[in-house]
Design a protein with these regions (language model features):
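Basic- and hydrophobic-enriched, low-structure N-terminal and domain-boundary segments
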Residues: 1-152, 156-159, 196, 202-204, ...
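P-loop NTPase motor domains
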Residues: 14, 22-29, 140-453, 468, ...
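Extended hydrophobic/Leu-rich segments
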Residues: 39-43, 54, 107, 198-206, ...
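Short alpha-helical interface patches
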Residues: 49, 54-56, 64-118, 238-248, ...
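A broad, low-specificity signal for short, low-complexity segments enriched in glycine/proline
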Residues: 77, 103-110, 117, 123-136, ...
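General secondary-structure edge motif
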Residues: 99-101, 126, 142-143, 330, ...
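Conserved long hydrophobic alpha-helices within structured protein cores
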Residues: 115-121, 396-403, 497
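Conserved ATP-driven motor cores of ASCE-family P-loop NTPases powering translocation/secretion/packaging/pilus
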Residues: 445-547
Length: 609
């Protein structure tokens, strides 16, 4: 079948030359009809007989005539082939570049017809939350990179409008704690539950059904206004212990010299041993950082007595006698290979790294867990991570929380839900550069998409990301299908953005005037390549404008989203101070039970009420 189609195509392409060749057989017939003893006489006679030969539209089938037709048709085909082969390639109007701004038609395939099911990007552009659209080529991940200098509206023009969509679970980094205060009541109210037709669902009484959010908060500015977060509660295996230790070391400082790999590895051994013992052997109520601190405080080392055993040594000796292949024992034995002086230095470094846990409030807030990080993909939840934008002393807790969050949700998606969480989880990481390093983030952003998780990094400059993640920063940026520039003047960001936008071809003309005995004028037209927006133009971009780049689509120069136009704006504290969320009242109204607290449970029958 394929061969027949190829022959048909070949015949169609060469049909004009075949017809011309058949018509040219008449010239062969005219030559044969011409009278003359030699070629010159035949040429003179050809003029007389040619009109008669051409009167017939039917080709001559005489062998000589067919040869003439074949030569004429073949010669023309050869001439056309040679001309096309050597032809110059012109791209009129695109000689120096084809860059242009995107239009409504460019973004249309990526927008969901139901407004609430979109990620808001700009005033006129949005991206569907559907990770499996009808046309697979329009599928894009929901990772977003937002770059904007101080005061460019990263929170007001982008983060808050997306929080108002209320189509997913949210993890929001909240510098200063203002986002929770302004949007908390809106989330408590929730959004109407939408049916398959995109319309709000109603109960049997005709009332609209709302889906209120569970609200969780970790406040590192004021621990009295925070729920409890215990990283130990999410340890389920030996690899979880190593992940926790890696995050702790990456975001805290010890006493070893910067970049000294020995001290880092030695501390890792000790932390793994102690946390392993706490996880596998200690009661649930003692599985926290307070117990870890007590262990380190009890580890006395005597440089002049290598045989001395402190209480922790005795505990591990007893564990080894009972379980010689225990994970904690194997790690502790490696740590004990260090000589007395070295071991003392390791303990000093550990003490310095965990010095913040000498603060009673921090020990109390990490005593047990209320955040339930592994349930964020089960039902709509909003987790606010409040951190200081001036003091990074406790930001390691935020980084630790994100690390455990990503790992827990990915594992739950794979083990429980067949690879995809029932509720999409969006991480809106404002002031991303201030929370510290999330280990293996470059790998996480590449793999979380398929689990219905997305990460949105909000930065003041692109160089901030490179300062933290070094060479991996480009990999992280490459896995962000969407990037938005809200304005700024950081040179590296402007240079890279101008290069990515590309060049367009413009028309220019030059005028000249020469004076002498006679005055003459000249006018010269030419084409040049110009950057779609140069660095200086980006630096002075209008404060109400932003630049959107979506993978595979032309860039957009658009207006920033007007938060007051959102349907849910009226439920926020920005619209009415009465909508302000009271964190203290919210936390005090909740029943909080500690792990060792005893209470009575009653079952109430409301059927007869």
């Amino acid at each position: 079948m394929k061969k027949t189609l190829d022959i048909k195509k070949l015949v169609l392409l060469n049909m004009p030359y075949i017809l011309l060749g058949l018509f040219a057989t008449n010239f062969g017939e005219a030559w044969r009809m011409a009278q003359g003893a030699d070629a010159s006489e035949k040429f003179l006679s050809l003029v007389a007989v040619l009109p008669g030969a051409l009167q017939s539209f039917w080709p001559s089938l005489h062998p000589l005539d067919l040869l003439v037709g074949l030569c004429c048709g073949g010669s023309l085909r050869l001439a056309v082939y040679l001309k096309s082969k050597n032809a110059k390639k012109y791209r009129h109007g695109l000689e120096y570049g084809s860059a242009r701004w995107g239009t409504r038609e460019d973004i249309a395939p990526y927008v969901d017809p139901v407004f609430q099911n979109n990620v808001i990007l700009t005033k006129t552009e949005s991206l569907t939350m559907n990770s499996r659209p009808k046309d697979p080529k329009t599928a894009r991940n929901k990772n977003v990179l937002v770059i904007g200098g101080s005061g460019s509206g990263k929170t007001r023009f982008w983060l808050k409008p997306n929080l108002m969509q209320m189509h997913s679970s949210y993890v929001v980094t909240d510098p200063k704690g203002t986002i929770l205060v302004e949007c908390g009541k809106m989330l408590q109210r929730g959004a109407p539950k939408l049916g398959k037709d995109g319309k709000p669902m109603k109960d049997k009484h005709g009332k609209v059904i709302y889906e209120p959010y569970r609200i969780k908060v970790l406040n590192t500015i004021n621990f009295k206004k925070s729920m409890h977060y215990n990283p130990f509660a999410y340890i389920h295996s030996e690899k979880d212990i190593l992940k926790l230790v890696t995050t702790l070391i990456a975001n805290t400082k010890g006493e070893g010299k910067a970049g000294d790999d020995f001290w880092v590895k030695a501390e890792t051994l000790l932390y793994c041993a102690l946390i392993g013992y706490i996880h596998y052997e200690a009661p649930v109520e003692e599985q926290n950082f307070s117990t870890l601190i007590e262990f380190i405080n009890a580890m006395e080392v005597r440089e002049d007595d290598e045989e001395f055993k402190n209480p922790v040594d005795l505990m591990f000796d007893a564990l080894e006698a009972e379980k010689p292949n225990h994970f904690a024992v194997r790690q502790y034995k490696k740590y004990k290979l260090a000589a007395g002086k070295t071991a003392k230095s390791i303990l000093i470094s550990c003490g310095a790294r965990l010095a913040v846990f000498d603060i009673a409030e921090l020990r109390e807030v990490t005593a047990y867990d209320e955040l339930e990080l592994d349930t964020l993909g089960d039902q709509k939840t909003a987790l606010f991570l409040i951190m200081s934008d001036t003091d990074d002393s406790f930001n390691f807790l935020i980084s630790m929380c994100y690390t455990q969050l990503f790992n827990l949700l990915c594992e739950k998606a794979d083990d429980v839900y067949g690879g995809r969480l029932p509720v999409h989880v969006r991480c809106l990481i404002d002031e991303c550069a201030n929370i510290g390093q999330i280990p293996k983030l470059e790998k996480l952003v590449a793999t979380i998409r398929s689990r219905e998780i997305s990460a949105c990094l909000v930065l003041q400059a692109q160089s901030q990301l490179k300062a933290i993640y070094k060479d991996n920063a480009d990999t992280i940026i490459g896995n962000m299908d969407t990037s938005i520039f809200l304005g700024g003047k950081e040179p590296t960001t402007l240079k890279e953005l101008a290069a990515v936008l590309g060049k367009e071809t413009i028309d220019t003309y030059n005028t000249g005037e020469s004076r002498g005995r006679e005055t003459s004028h000249s006018l010269n037209y030419q084409k040049l390549g110009k950057e779609l927006m140069s660095q200086d133009e980006l630096a002075v971009m209008d404060g109400g404008k932003c630049i959107l780049q979506l993978r595979g689509v032309r860039p957009f120069l658009s207006d920033k989203y007007d938060i007051t136009k959102h349907p849910n704006f009226k439920y926020t504290a920005d619209a009415d101070d009465k909508n302000a969320f009271d964190i203290e009242a919210f936390l005090s109204a909740r029943l909080k039970l500690k792990p060792n607290e005893v209470c009575d449970v009653y079952e109430v029958d409301t059927k007869g009420a």
